[in-house]
């Protein structure tokens, strides 16, 4: 009984497995048959589909810009440092105790503003002594002159000798000399008293104080009381290659002030604009450069002493120049070239002669004309005569020129 029961279960399991296998076989055959007509139809419709894809792949995408005609400024550039127009260390010209400071650190001051005071007591005493001596000698001189006048009258009647008259004349002259010396002493004492009040010698910004109130200071102190830097105006000192000297001199002879721009350390933001002040009188033989100084009004305090800046000096403007983006200009074995697009969006290599150039645009002196479209991006995929797809047209400069560039791209796409 038990053996018959086990045999029955084995038969059931085998039947179930066979049924499942038959179902999967039938299902796979139906899917294969339903897919075959579609594949046959597709093969009939496109007998050479694979070969066609290999024969004509997608067009290479590029970006293009239109060469434009415009006035282009010519700049000379150099690295420079901002320097104060004047730097003055304010020192005391008399010895004494510092009684007061009349400025705030970092404050802008005018020439003549009171900065500090030295104890004036000793100078007032010296002035009073000099004035007293002057008054005494003034009275002595007046008396000597009166005696001389009497001697002169008596000499006419021979009541005094000639020797006595000459002696009185000499006494008057001596007293006059003493009186003049007393006047000088009074002036000197007054000057010493005036110097006890220390004033700003120039307009500018005061720095940090170098001495505190209460200290004894002297005219021989080298550190001084405070340093004033004149920043209105302020100067920019930079260098140019000696090869640019002729260009600068010729521009100066034209009679117009040369504009100099100060740009920040990253050369991305213009800080201020000034004019050329002077060229140095000799070239640095070590570096082959010449120092140039420009002056800026700096009323907005955009420039600060010892600040590092990039200098740009406008020396000329090239009129009616053909300009393209710098990205379009390439260099090969034959020289500089650009890829030019025709009306069918086919490219051809044109050798060109570049001129003034910066990071954004370049002047082309020969090789293309205004209105020509040049490839600015996707250049590595180009071959002579290849047809391309212009995916974006960029202007060389202004929004108006950008619109013109788009119009050229549309015309090429329609052709």
Curated annotation (Swiss-Prot):
It is found in: Cell inner membrane. SUPFAM superfamilies: HlyD-like secretion proteins (SSF111369). Keywords: Cell inner membrane, Cell membrane, Membrane, Signal, Transport. Its main location: membrane. Belongs to the membrane fusion protein (MFP) (TC 8.A.1) family. PANTHER family: MULTIDRUG RESISTANCE PROTEIN MDTA. This is Multidrug resistance protein MdtA. It comes from Escherichia fergusonii (strain ATCC 35469 / DSM 13698 / CCUG 18766 / IAM 14443 / JCM 21226 / LMG 7866 / NBRC 102419 / NCTC 12128 / CDC 0568-73).
């Amino acid at each position: 009984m038990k053996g018959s029961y086990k045999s029955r279960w084995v038969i059931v399991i085998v039947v179930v497995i066979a049924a499942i296998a038959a179902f999967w076989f039938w299902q796979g055959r139906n899917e294969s048959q339903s897919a075959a007509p579609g594949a046959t139809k597709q093969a009939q419709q496109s007998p050479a589909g694979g070969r066609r894809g290999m024969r004509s792949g997608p067009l290479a995408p590029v970006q293009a810009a239109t060469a434009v005609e415009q006035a282009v400024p010519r700049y000379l550039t150099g690295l420079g440092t901002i320097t104060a127009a004047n730097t003055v260390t304010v020192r005391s010209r008399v010895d004494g105790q510092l009684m007061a400071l009349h400025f705030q650190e970092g404050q802008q001051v005018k020439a003549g503003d009171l900065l500090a005071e030295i104890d004036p007591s000793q100078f007032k005493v010296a002035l009073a002594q000099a004035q007293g001596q002057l008054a005494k000698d003034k009275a002595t001189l007046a008396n000597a002159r009166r005696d001389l006048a009497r001697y002169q009258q008596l000499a006419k009647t021979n009541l005094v000798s000639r020797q006595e008259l000459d002696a009185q004349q000499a006494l008057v002259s001596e007293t006059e000399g003493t009186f003049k010396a007393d006047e000088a002493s009074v002036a000197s004492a007054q000057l010493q008293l005036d110097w006890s009040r220390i004033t700003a010698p120039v307009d500018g910004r005061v720095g940090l104080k170098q001495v505190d109130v209460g200290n004894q200071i002297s005219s021989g102190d080298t550190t001084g009381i405070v340093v004033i830097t004149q920043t209105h105006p302020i100067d920019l000192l930079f260098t140019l290659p000696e090869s640019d000297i002729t260009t600068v001199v010729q521009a100066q002879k034209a009679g117009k002030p040369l504009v100099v721009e100060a740009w920040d350390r990253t050369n991305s933001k213009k800080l201020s604009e000034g004019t050329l002040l002077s060229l140095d009188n000799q070239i640095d033989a070590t570096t082959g450069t010449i120092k140039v100084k420009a002056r800026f009004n700096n009323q907005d305090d955009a420039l600060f002493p010892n600040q590092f800046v990039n200098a740009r000096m406008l020396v000329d403007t090239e009129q009616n120049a053909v300009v393209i983006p710098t990205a379009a200009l390439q260099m090969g074995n034959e020289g500089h070239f650009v890829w030019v697009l025709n009306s069918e969006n086919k490219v051809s290599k044109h050798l060109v002669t570049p001129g003034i150039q910066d990071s954004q645009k370049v002047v082309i002196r020969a090789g293309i004309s205004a209105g020509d479209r040049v490839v600015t991006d996707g250049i590595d995929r180009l071959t002579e005569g290849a047809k391309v797809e212009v995916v974006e047209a960029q202007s060389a400069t202004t929004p108006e020129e950008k619109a013109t560039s788009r119009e050229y791209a549309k015309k090429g796409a329609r052709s």
